[in-house]
Amino acid sequence: MAVEGTAFDFRTPHAIGDMIDADNEQLKNGRGYDMNWVLNREDNGEVVKVMSIYEPQSGRAMDVLTDQIAMQFYSGNFFDGTYDGKYSKPLAFRESVVFETQKYPDAVNHSNFPSVILTPDEEYKHTCIYHFYISR
């Protein structure tokens, strides 16, 4: 799916909440972001920065570096205070985000996707670095 001009286009930085409630079937079904992004890179094992997130009020920031070709992004759409997070604080609706680096979902069923088959003689390894810092 091409992201240009859609709520899924984060190539130019903007707040996650800017378009989270856009008139889009995928966003409505997921009550927000819960999609996999193709990272437009080769599956060559090189670790590169694939995304950054920044909270301007506190200056908290995070970069994600990986050797993977895709990333799942979830915006806490089904948290309702039922479950506790850090320090026993209830997890509220859209109060958190998740970034999971990975291969393409359902790749095992698509011969045109990079293989995710691991044979008994192979070892699996991938790298994901979450770099936290303050940016002012």
What are the residue ranges of the model-derived segments?
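Active-site pocket scaffolds in enzymes
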Residues: 5-136
